[in-house]
C-alpha cells in the first residue's frame, strides 16, 4: 500500500499555501510537523480529496485519487480541525448517521460504535447532545467518526487539540496499535503527539516539505547544538534575553537548570545533551513558543 503525493501545489489568489510537495507514504504513523500557517491543513484537505490542487496529484497504489472517487473515500478516514454536526445530534445519533453515510452495514454499526465509544471514553456521554460537550469530548467524537469505516488511510489534523494529558496518552497508544498495515498521517504542531509513535516525520515550512526521516535521522542535524547547564536564579532574566532557552527547572539553593539551543556553548559549565524532536522543531521554527502553540 502506498500513497504518493507528486508535485502538489495550491495557490490562493496571490498566496501559495502548498508549493510543489513530493512525499510517498507507506504503512505506519507519519508525523507532519510545522508551525501554524505552514500549509499543513491545506495539504491534508487535498490528500482527503476535498480540495482541488492547483497543480500535481495524489496517487493511491498508482491510481489518481480523483479518478478513484468513492473507492478511495471508502478506504479513507479524516479528522479535520473542525467538523460539522447538527446541534440536536447526540453522540450516538451522529455516529450512526456518519456510519450510514459511509455505507457501513447496519449489523456492524452498533458494535463498531460501542467499541470506539469505549476506547475514546465516550460511553457515558453517548446520549448527550454534541453541542453540550466540552471541546475535548467533541474532539474525541470527531476521532471516532474518522475511524468508523476502519480506514486503510487515516489523516488527522490536530487530533489532540483540547484533550487532557491522560486522553492524549490513550489516543497515542490507540493510534500506534491501529497503524499496523495502515497509513496514519497526523498533522500537528504539538511535537509530543507524535515523537514516540511516529514511524517517520515530514517537516513542513512555508508550504514546502523541507525534511523527511525517522526521529533519529532528523535530530542528527542538531547534535551538539542542545545544551544543559545550571545557573543562579538571579541570572535567568539575562540568559532569557540572549539565549534560546527551551526548558527550565528550579533546583535547590536558588539554582535553575536550563536547556538551550546554540551552535556553541554560551555558558561556562554547559554540556551537550541528546537532542529530541522537540528541539529540532524549535531549531527550525525559532519564533515558536511551545506553550502558546500547545494552547
Name these PLM-found stretches.
Residues 170-258:
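ABC transporter nucleotide-binding domain
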